[in-house]
Curated annotation (Swiss-Prot):
Motif annotated as LPXTG sorting signal, chain positions: 1182-1186
Pentaglycyl murein peptidoglycan amidated threonine, modified sites: 1185
Gene name for this UniProt entry: yhcR
Name this protein carries in UniProt: Endonuclease YhcR
Family: In the C-terminal section; belongs to the 5'-nucleotidase family.
A GO term for molecular function: nucleotide binding
């Protein structure tokens, strides 16, 4: 038994031994096979990785919408806001580029906006690289929402692709197809249907038609193209655009080819006005020849924009414009009130228009149908009440749902109040509207009674509204005092006229509503509109009781119950009305002479080139010459007054300012000024000093025994803060031959931010128009109707158009005001706004204003006015002896100080505002401030630099004229980040920077109006949280205006220094050589590559308001869109993925990493793919590579095989036991 067992065990061991050898062999085979497989896989993956990824098209990317993608397309422009692209240079930034599959495929739906990271902007931003436009670009990034559409963000690489192949020629398309390819370049062919010289208005503008459609050909430069005439067969290549709804093709520079001439025209399609304006045929036939039969209802008396907008209607009063261009001569063959068959091109300017091309396009119908008449009664259902005399219906009546109540004119509610009169109008307008809502509710059935004139110029139906109960709502508005009557000739129904006029007379007698004497409507609605809209009164006013009419301005002379309004005097006379004759009245002549903005320049004279031809026209100014002109002009008239509009003192020459401007006051008294107002500079030294100037009293720097000014200063909007009482009289009344003439004073509210807050702490400047209107009401109650305003408020003139604060004042103030003497912005102005004469006589005594008026002695009102600006030309008059003596006296006193030479200028140095970058003189002054106070930085406001510094010896007087305000330097402590806020505040969105600077430099972005890059003068960084010292003047440190306020708020621990002039004098003295400051580039517009991604959220586009009669404008978004920074940066450290300066290259250069790939020759740069820090917040990941895949498989295989080997070993061990 034992031997058998041993034999069995031996056999089993032999078996196990043999089995172990077999397992080892199998394991070796598996390992070898696995390693060979992995090696093959590695080679396969490496080859696969080496194959370049093929880019997808822009259309494919747009369809894909999301995910990683390599896209390729042409740079066609830049996204400026959702669905709006700028397609031509110059571009405003480098934040994004728009790609499309073709250079001319630029409809928004075919464009992919690509966000450009900061690392690529120097190479791919279109502001920096405008020549990149039209180049083919390949971009690797992530598809996601950008500018509210599919875009490409998180960009990893950008390359310019070789695009040397000639693109396929653009295939010709039909006009109908071309009309649907907005912003794309197309080629079309057709027949010219009108001579461009007949309908083009001086431009290349005519129409092309084929069998499928028509389109306008337009270019503002006709001289670049052949003249197009009717019947030409032409081929046009250009871009499809749209203007005011009209589809146009703008031809390329050589994009018009004339194939043949004298070809037959397409036959015009006979349509109706209703089919065009209320159906789809308008769009279908736009740009094509059509025929219409219509009635000419009105022909304007004068053209607008090179042609006449004639109104034509059909039998049902559907209206359309017949646009008759001057060059056609057609207007002279048209008769109002006739039926015609018109042939022309269907055009569009927001709404459809018909353009006749020649006289043959007009055919007067031989049998004239009766004129269209809408007169009658129509049923309707109320939808809503719009205002006190307008409602909307649920369904159209005569083509419109808008009903304007006829015979009445309710107070307006469309406006935002700016003064008491506006508030009053709005309050009564709401009362009328609220009343209307009590009698008319949505769903109410009404009857609309329409007269012979069916619609107004806005397309609203004119009618009387009758309720189901028979109540005439129009008449009830008048009876209850919610609205006055309003009849415009012709009057349809005499019975209606008498009924309404009797109702308004009764309401007025009973003082109902708007007629309440204790709370009246301040302005009739038509009077309010004339003022608020700035158009003035234009309709002549007839008196139905005696058949006379008066000028528009005299409307008050006719009682409301007798008023009928006419479009012109000739219309009134055609209706049988005669011009109202009044007995000849004796008129009182009055001359008013004016000055403004003298600024104490009593000794200064100027060489001027008045006509801008480059030749000096003479020497102008100096107060003894101005005195001679004023006295001479005063002597020419029996009645003369001399006035001024402020800023006569302050910022003065040394000869005046060294003695507290008492020399200027003495000269004004010698000349004989009668009244003036205050400007902001009258407050330069505060209210106490201004009162001393007016009332007298000695000043340490003034003359002994100073007795004050002998004429008043008036200011209606200068009020005491504590009580609201006047700081100065609101007005002054001067009797001229028994007629009172009043002068109201007013100063711009912005003066509060232009002077030392401490000096005016007890007063405030209230709303100008409100103050003037209140003063005018007081004057009218006193029987004063001849009223002028001395307004230290801006005005400027371009041709006949006057704008600015004074123009706004003219539109907002009482109609009894006849003349406004403007000031503040140193301009020459002479013209009218809203019936008010506005005059401004330049600056510094260079000119005077001469206003001549005539006053009706009976009405005491100004009935005639005119003005001229007379320059103080020294060559045409001798200086006034008395004024010369006064001037000489004070020049002698000031001479020793003024004439001291303190330095020498090697060049002319300009100063002022830094709108266009730093200025030489501004740099000099700012450096002097910084040196005087030994600070890190200095700032000087542009308005404080009053003159330029001329080449040659520099006197104390020269520097005084440059810095005349006597401000004191102030040192403040600020943080580095505060400096940025201070600088940003002074950058105007319109004009740019203000301050001159020292100790640092900065660049700024015109789009954002913000500083971009700020550095110390030596180029080192300004640390945001470090403390620095800053020098400003005490005006800047304490002013409360928006641009100055951050200085006072952020500056700490103020230290007072010397006067600014003293610092400049000492700095100039410190130079051993002639001073030659230049424009150094301390302030520059930012290069696009300097601008960081400025926003971190979706762009917000504000919706414009709905202004009646206007389209919503498409404007470029001032922000660059949602340009999210791809890499977050920590202040003071280099950005993780920022390319080094040496890597910044232009397109078609070697890539950044200098590593050749299949596309090396055309690659620009590839963003390095480094592992990001936790702070970066970026989701950029390394892409899968063959190496990564291979390593993963090797590790997996090794683990698997190791496990298998261990398992076998364990089994083997178990078997042995």
């Amino acid at each position: 038994m034992l031997s058998v067992e041993m034999i069995s065990r031996q056999n089993r061991c032999h078996y196990v031994y043999k089995g172990g050898n077999m397992m080892r062999r199998i394991l070796h085979i598996v390992l070898i096979t696995a390693l060979m497989f992995l090696n093959v896989m590695y080679t396969f993956e490496a080859v696969k990785a080496a194959e370049p990824q093929q880019p997808i098209s822009i259309e494919k990317a747009i369809q894909q919408k999301e995910g990683q993608a390599l896209v390729e397309g042409y740079a066609v422009g830049q996204a400026v806001s959702p669905q709006h692209y700028k397609l031509t240079s110059p571009f405003s930034n480098d934040y994004n580029v728009a790609l499309a599959d073709r250079k001319n495929k630029t409809s928004p739906e075919h464009i992919l906006p690509v966000q450009i990271p900061s690392a690529f902007r120097s190479q791919f931003g279109l502001q920096t690289n405008p020549l990149l436009l039209g180049k083919k670009i390949t971009v690797q990034g992530k598809l996601e929402n950008y500018f509210n559409t599919t875009g490409l963000k998180n960009v990893q690489s950008m390359n310019v692709t070789d695009d040397t192949k000639t693109p396929p020629a653009e295939q010709q398309v039909t006009i109908n197809e071309a009309r649907g390819r907005l912003n794309e370049e197309v080629t079309i062919k057709g027949i010219i249907t009108a001579d461009q010289n007949a309908i083009g208005g001086g431009k290349l503008s005519t129409f092309l038609q084929d069998e499928t459609g028509g389109i306008n050909i337009y270019s503002p430069s006709p001289e670049q193209f052949p003249e197009l005439k009717e019947g030409m067969d032409v081929t046009v290549t250009g871009k499809i655009t749209s203007y005011q709804g009209l589809k146009e093709i703008v031809p390329n520079s050589s994009g018009i080819k004339i194939n043949q001439s004298n070809q037959s025209l397409p036959a015009p399609k006979h349509l109706t006005i209703n089919e065009l304006i209320n159906g789809s045929l308008g769009d279908q036939y736009e740009g094509r020849l059509v025929k219409l039969t219509a009635f000419v209802s009105s022909i304007p008396s004068s053209p607008a924009g090179g042609g006449y907008n004639v109104t034509m209607i059909d039998d049902d009063h559907h209206a359309m414009t017949l646009r008759v261009m001057n060059e056609t001569g057609v207007i002279n063959e048209l008769d109002e009130g006739k039926w015609y068959e018109f042939t022309g091109v269907l055009s569009r300017y927001q709404t459809f228009q018909l353009l006749p091309r020649k006289s043959a396009d007009l055919k007067l119908l031989e049998e004239q149908p009766a004129p269209p008449s809408a007169e009658g009664e129509y049923e309707g259902i109320v939808d809503r009440v719009v205002d006190g005399d307008t409602i909307h219906l649920k369904s159209p009546v005569l083509g419109t749902t808008k009903i304007r109540f006829v015979n009445v004119d309710a107070p307006e509610t469309y406006h935002t109040p700016k003064n008491d009169a506006d508030e009053n109008q709005l309050r009564f307008g709401k009362k009328a509207s609220d009343y209307l809502k009590t009698v008319l509710s949505p769903g109410d059935k009404i009857t609309v009674k329409v007269g012979s004139e069916a619609k107004d110029s806005y397309g609203r139906l004119l009618g009387q509204v009758i309720t189901e109960s028979g109540s005439n709502v129009n008449l009830e508005l008048v009876k209850n005092g919610y609205a006055p009557t309003y009849f415009i000739w012709p009057v349809d129904n005499e019975e209606d006229y008498q009924q309404f006029q009797a109702a308004v007379a009764a309401a007025k007698k009973d003082q109902k509503g708007i007629w309440n004497e204790n709370d009246p409507l301040m302005e009739m609605p038509f009077e309010f509109r004339a003022r608020e809209q700035g158009k003035g009164l234009t309709r002549y006013v007839g008196d139905s009781s005696n058949k006379t009419y008066v000028q528009p301005a005299d409307w008050k002379k006719i009682a409301v119950e007798n008023r009928i309004f006419f479009a012109s005097a000739s219309e009134a006379e055609s209706a049988g009305y005669k011009k109202r004759q009044t007995a000849p009245q004796e008129h009182v002549p009055l001359r008013i002479l004016s000055m403004n903005d003298l600024h104490g320049k009593i000794d200064q004279q100027y060489e001027l080139d008045l006509d801008g031809n480059g030749t000096v026209d003479g020497t102008f100014g100096r107060m003894d010459y101005a005195a001679a002109y004023l006295k001479e002009k005063k002597a020419e008239k029996k009645n003369s007054l001399i006035v001024h509009a402020g800023d006569m003192i302050g910022g003065s020459s040394p000869v005046s300012s060294l003695l507290q401007d008492e020399p200027t006051v003495e000269l004004m008294e010698d000349i004989g000024f009668d009244v003036g107002t205050v400007g902001n500079h009258e407050f330069d030294e505060g209210t106490d000093e201004l009162l001393r100037i007016l009332n007298g009293g000695d000043h340490p720097k003034g003359t002994s025994g100073y007795d004050g000014q002998n004429f008043p200063l008036v200011c209606a909007n200068c009020k005491m803060k504590s009580t609201g009482e006047p700081f100065l009289p609101a007005y002054d009344i001067i009797n001229v031959e028994g007629v009172p003439v009043a002068f109201i004073g007013v100063v711009t509210q912005s003066a509060a931010g232009m002077v030392m807050p401490e000096g005016i702490k007890n007063i405030e400047f209230t709303d100008e128009a409100t103050a003037v209107n209140k003063a005018a009401e007081e004057l009218k109650k006193k029987g004063v109707k001849a009223i002028a305003v001395l307004a230290h408020m801006s005005a400027e003139q371009n041709g006949n158009a006057i704008t600015g604060e004074s123009a706004d004042l003219a539109n907002k103030t009482d109609s009894e005001i006849d003349v406004i003497f403007a000031a503040h912005n140193h301009q020459v102005v002479n013209g009218e706004v809203n019936g008010k004469l506005i005059v401004q006589a330049f600056e510094y005594g260079k000119a005077i204003g001469v206003v001549d008026v005539e006053i009706d002695k009976t009405t005491k009102d100004i009935v005639k006015k005119s003005a001229e600006i007379v320059y103080v030309d020294q060559s045409k008059i001798e200086p006034d002896v008395s004024a010369s003596a006064i001037l000489k006296k004070y020049e002698t006193i000031a001479e020793p100080i003024i004439s001291e030479v303190v330095g020498e200028a090697a060049v002319d140095m300009e100063g002022g505002y830094s709108n266009d970058g730093d200025t030489p003189l501004g740099n000099l002054i700012a450096d002097g401030m910084r040196a005087a106070m030994k600070t890190d930085f200095a700032l000087m406001n542009g308005g404080g630099i009053r003159e330029a510094l001329k080449k040659g010896p520099i006197t104390w007087g020269d520097l005084y004229n440059i810095q005349p305000f006597g401000n004191v330097l102030t040192k403040l402590e600020i943080k580095g980040k505060d400096l940025r806020e201070i600088i940003n505040a002074q950058i105007s969105p319109v004009f740019g920077p203000d301050y001159s600077i020292s100790g640092f430099t900065y660049t700024w972005d015109k789009e954002t109006g913000k500083a971009v890059d700020m550095k110390m003068a030596d180029g080192t960084e300004i640390q945001p949280d470090a403390t620095y010292t800053l020098t400003v003047n005490n005006f800047m440190a304490t002013a409360t205006g928006a641009k100055y306020q951050p200085i006072g708020l952020l500056g700490k621990n103020p230290v007072t220094g010397p006067e600014d002039l003293e610092a400049t004098v000492e700095y100039v003295k410190s130079f051993d050589e002639p001073i030659a400051y230049t424009k150094e580039g301390r302030i520059k517009l930012a290069e696009a590559s300097d601008i960081e991604d400025p926003v971190t959220e979706d762009p917000i586009t504000e919706e414009p308001g709905d202004d009646p009669g206007t389209e919503d404008p498409i404007k470029e978004d001032p922000r660059p869109g949602e340009d999210l920074p791809d890499i977050k940066e920590t202040p003071g450290t280099a950005p993780v993925h920022q390319l080094p300066p040496s890597a910044i290259s232009r397109f078609n250069e070697i890539p950044i990493n200098n590593t050749k790939t299949a596309d090396t020759a055309n690659s620009i740069s590839t963003l390095p793919l480094q592992t990001e820090t936790a702070e970066s917040g970026s989701d950029h990941q390394l892409p899968d590579t063959s190496a990564g895949y291979y390593n993963f498989m090797v590790i997996g295989a090794a683990v698997t095989l190791s496990g298998t080997y261990l398992y076998v070993r364990r089994k083997r061990s178990a078997s042995r036991t």
